[in-house]
Amino acid sequence: MAYSYTEKKRIRKDFSKLPDVMDVPYLLAIQLDSYREFLQAGATKEQFRDIGLHAAFKSVFPIISYSGNAALEYVGYRLGEPAFDVKECVLRGVTFAVPLRVKVRLIIFDRESSNKAIKDIKEQEVYMGEIPLMTENGTFIINGTERVIVSQLHRSPGVFFDHDRGKTHSSGKLLYSARIIPYRGSWLDFEFDPKDCVFVRIDRRRKLPASVLLRALGYSTEEILNAFYATNVFHIKGETLNLELVPQRLRGEVASIDIKDGSGKVIVEQGRRITARHINQLEKAGVSQLEVPFDYLIGRTIAKAIVHPATGEIIAECNTELTLDLLAKVAKAQVVRIETLYTNDIDCGPFISDTLKIDNTSNQLEALVEIYRMMRPGEPPTKEAAETLFGNLFFSAERYDLSAVGRMKFNRRIGRTEIEGPGVLSKEDIIDVLKTLVDIRNGKGIVDDIDHLGNRRVRCVGEMAENQFRVGLVRVERAVKERLSMAESEGLMPQDLINAKPVAAAIKEFFGSSQLSQFMGQNNPLSEITHKRRVSALGPGGLTRERAGFEVRDVHPTHYGRVCPIETPEGPNIGLINSLATYARTNKYGFLESPYRVVKDSLVTDEIVFLSAIEEADHVIAQASATLNEKGQLVDELVAVRHLNEFTVKAPEDVTLMDVSPKQVVSVAASLIPFLEHDDANRALMGSNMQRQAVPTLRADKPLVGTGMERNVARDSGVCVVARRGGVIDSVDASRVVVRVADDEVETGEAGVDIYNLTKYTRSNQNTCINQRPLVSKGDVVARGDILADGPSTDMGELALGQNMRVAFMPWNGFNFEDSICLSERVVQEDRFTTIHIQELTCVARDTKLGPEEITADIPNVGEAALNKLDEAGIVYVGAEVQAGDILVGKVTPKGETQLTPEEKLLRAIFGEKASDVKDTSLRVPTGTKGTVIDVQVFTRDGVERDSRALSIEKMQLDQIRKDLNEEFRIVEGATFERLRAALVGAKAEGGPALKKGTEITDDYLDGLERGQWFKLRMADDALNEQLEKAQAYISDRRQLLDDKFEDKKRKLQQGDDLAPGVLKIVKVYLAIKRRIQPGDKMAGRHGNKGVVSVIMPVEDMPHDANGTPVDIVLNPLGVPSRMNVGQILETHLGLAAKGLGEKINRMLEEQRKVAELRKFLHEIYNEIGGREENLDELGDNEILALAKNLRGGVPMATPVFDGAKEREIKAMLKLADLPESGQMRLFDGRTGNQFERPTTVGYMYMLKLNHLVDDKMHARSTGSYSLVTQQPLGGKAQFGGQRFGEMEVWALEAYGAAYTLQEMLTVKSDDVNGRTKMYKNIVDGDHRMEAGMPESFNVLIKEIRSLGIDIELETE
């Protein structure tokens, strides 16, 4: 394989044995693809597919007026251009969105004509609000903050059969039910009651007998019975009664008479149970009629009404039970044929028949009225109202939609072959569902498993946005219908009919405040990527935390390869919020699919198929680690497989599919944990969750022991700068990289230059620092997809969340008791865990009713020293180091007791008497914060004069833009002239500046000309003249284009900012705060091994080895056995080997060994100890040297999950590094120099500093605000709260009998308002007496009692 620009600089030793059949897919595809389909941005009218916005419009339009004389049709839509780019939106606090313009057609029909002739057509584009755009990293910028829309896992529409698990009735009887769930519309439930009658519920209202619904559909009793039951036919001939025999139906019954064949031979004796053997004999004997006694009919149910043969009078209605009296009537009327329902207790129960018996309705109208009463209790029913209501419930496309998914699931579940059909229900659908339900109750068929991923589907961003959009459009539709009737009379245009506000409001509400629109976690690249790959069962139309039971949260066999069984939050959301597995994707119906390799006759092919949970059930699927021979055949006698959602073993020839990779089971975060297979699941869960909380350190350090997924995560997260096109690095500095694009990648009309402006010290959503550093040098050749610059937590294009620390597992004076961590001072000195946090502080100047607030350096009653960091505009300088309480932005607010008269205002304006009536409301640095000002932004409302600071910031920004554009032009111009030079040199000229006719043009001549004079050359060859003209035109076009671009940016910068009403000016100050690691900070490894730093020890006191190398961290060995996360120990051993090899390479470099020796040693490391072979021969000597230099700090290793390094390979690595194979060494106590009594495990572990810093949690208060009601201090750091002398503290003082102290505590020191102020006054006056009054809490108590309706008063005697 060819190495990319960054890979060849540092190759990871890979221990995996299994081949890569399939690359890890693009990790953000689920977000980007979904939203791309929703917008269909570049599509023309013909290319529009019936999805997303287009589908939403088509479902609501055409809108027809109530009279039917006017209609509004939808033609198409187009999206405009965004006003600002992503960075500008974040800065200005606006939404990154594009205007949506919809072309609609208003058609007015001629009232007079009979056949709806068209009288008038008007077509117009209508603005329908703004649609947020997704950034290229799968996020949305809403009001300046970066948000993510999390996908939702919800119950798929369709039909589901279930039972109550015996919980409803005390007998424990299983009550079966069926539920038809549409995508939108009313739910329809059928359920059995303990007496085995079937009931129906609509939208979970009160239940009605199911037959009411069937009657409402127009079925008669007889049709209902025919649909559900077979019939037994009896013939009456005089005194004999003959049954038309269907032998199969007799099975399991007890013979009430002897059953004989034609010859009179007894086949079944009376009283015997009829078995399958008897039935075979009856069929062989060809018995078709069976004479039965008349009492055989008693208790049977009539299937067809019995009619008097002579008079036509109905003797018995269908579905009545035959009694002796009825039989007598039948015999008297000489009826010759009776049909009864065939039912039995085993597999054909009389459920529908029983239901009809408890049904009070007798015809369709009564049934409709009954349903109307249930849906709209208290309203008088009319025939029309009842019919309309019922028709709209399930049979109107506007109110009810199963959706394509629902129809497919519905048809599959009830056993139909076609998977397409209408979105509304039909009579047959309802009958089929009831039949299936009755079959299940009869013991044929099984209930569904609701937690099966074939019954839950994923709703992605696009689909949710489309639903919201449709909601908005339906609101618009109501308004448009009202106005359409006016349209014809008043000659209105489409624009006058459509008010886009409801659409815009629906979209805004969804992106701004939906439960699934979340503030993006931006601690580090991994937390971004996992947030976008989240799948939540919560949210609108989903579950709620309180109602979700254990089953929904549990791991299901179908999660395999679709949803990660490890990564889920701890706490109330466990199992409800999941992460997508590495290779999972959604299919067109929204079901999660996983990839598999096809296996034919035990030969594994390279063909890959993606299957959903339903499709995979019938397959026999081998694991990715199954042993194959050279030909790719399965060789084991029995292979571990999955079949029918069970784990079992099968012969190789039965296997039909095979997993693609061992890591397809887990999510991205879990696949970053090396030796995951040796960790307990609970700890792995904590490990994958804590990696997301790691704070990017000052200098990222790649993990010595990784899994090989680090590069994918860094590349796909979007924090690195990736080359869009290949080329040569033209120039590079800390803030930008300029690439001159290779000629073969430049398309005509494009600029042959790519400029990448790097993000420098920007604040993330979590206040961590986003900073990019270039990796390339001038003149380097890069290819498309190479990494040009590292972002936060990335090191040479690999994810690097923490630091490699030398750890020892040993107790150390109790400092590592209970998971505490003992750190060496060296870690702090080397800034290993120093992080930068950026805080944004905002100062807003508003227009108050006493006059405008002003931002100024002229602040009353503030000394000169406090103002020395402000400029003349009253805003702090960039670069100033500030402490808590320093002024950042000076601001004064008018404080007038009285409102001024116009005359006074004028006098004030003339004489400028300010100080007397303004108060200081400056923005100050909050308590407990000190840092450096790194940026200031000033936003001014239109029409308000901009201050000097705003102008200087604007000038700086313009200079930067101009510099970029000039650079671009310089390269384009340079490339054009180079091409011209190649064509001109050596060609003959007709004339030109200081040139005779027929002279050959030389390099020297061209160098002597200014570039503008080149175009004055007249060549002998006309083609060259044409080329010169084209070049001249191209260059002037380019210049014009860039000038226009500059003017456009300038216009945007100079126009006023769109601020909230009443706001005149906003100043944002960004502070960078450097945080070193200190006791109280939380740290963790990748295996769920977390702890708090307890002490930072001097280097000389730390345990050290025989060479005098001290360890960085001492961890408690007792944290390992009970937690069962042994992966950390293996990581420590392999880390030691990696570091040891790096030191060995370093010694070779210092001794200036030959390149051949280096190459040989590298070959030993990479290719002789297990795992994947690396092709070092394709690297030249210089590249080998560069590689060796980068490996000095340690040779990075990759042990992929479930396919990692074996114990023997770790030992071999340790041996190669000349280290003890046990991974243990003798340590010495740094304080005494004595050797510890036994060898200690020492090695390198990757440690993270988590975003739970003691600085953010520690807080102190002397005086501060009080709660309004109780007059006690507020609680918590955010409210600047204090401590409360609470109930238990009062008990303590009571126990001591310290009455005076207690009185003081409960009154003047706490919430006796008058007492406190009096006390303060007394202390100032030097009078140390105390007068205790009434504590506010007592008043609260009295108010509480009064609120219960008890009159209580405190009377003073």
Swiss-Prot record:
Keyword line: DNA-directed RNA polymerase, Nucleotidyltransferase, Transcription, Transferase
GO MF term set: DNA binding; DNA-directed RNA polymerase activity; ribonucleoside binding
Swiss-Prot/TrEMBL GO biological process terms: DNA-templated transcription
Annotated CDD domains: RNA_pol_B_RPB2
EC number in record: 2.7.7.6
InterPro entries: DNA-dir_RNA_pol_bsu_ext_1_sf, DNA-dir_RNA_pol_bsu_external_1, DNA-dir_RNA_pol_su2, DNA-dir_RNAP_su2_dom, DNA-dir_RNAP_su2_hyb_sf, RNA_pol_bsu_bac, RNA_pol_bsu_CS, RNA_pol_bsu_protrusion
Nucleotidyltransferase in keyword set: yes
Enzyme class name: transferase
Keyword Transferase: yes
UniProt GO cellular component terms: DNA-directed RNA polymerase complex
Annotated catalysed reactions: RNA(n) + a ribonucleoside 5'-triphosphate = RNA(n+1) + diphosphate
Annotated transmembrane regions: none
Record's subunit section: The RNAP catalytic core consists of 2 alpha, 1 beta, 1 beta' and 1 omega subunit. When a sigma factor is associated with the core the holoenzyme is formed, which can initiate transcription.
PANTHER family reported in the protein's UniProt record: DNA-DIRECTED RNA POLYMERASE I SUBUNIT 2
Annotated function: DNA-dependent RNA polymerase catalyzes the transcription of DNA into RNA using the four ribonucleoside triphosphates as substrates.
NCBIfam families: PRK00405.1 (NF001616), rpoB (TIGR02013)
Entry's family note: Belongs to the RNA polymerase beta chain family.
Protein name per the record: DNA-directed RNA polymerase subunit beta
Organism from which the protein derives: Pseudomonas aeruginosa (strain UCBPP-PA14)
Lineage of the species this protein comes from: Bacteria, Pseudomonadati, Pseudomonadota, Gammaproteobacteria, Pseudomonadales
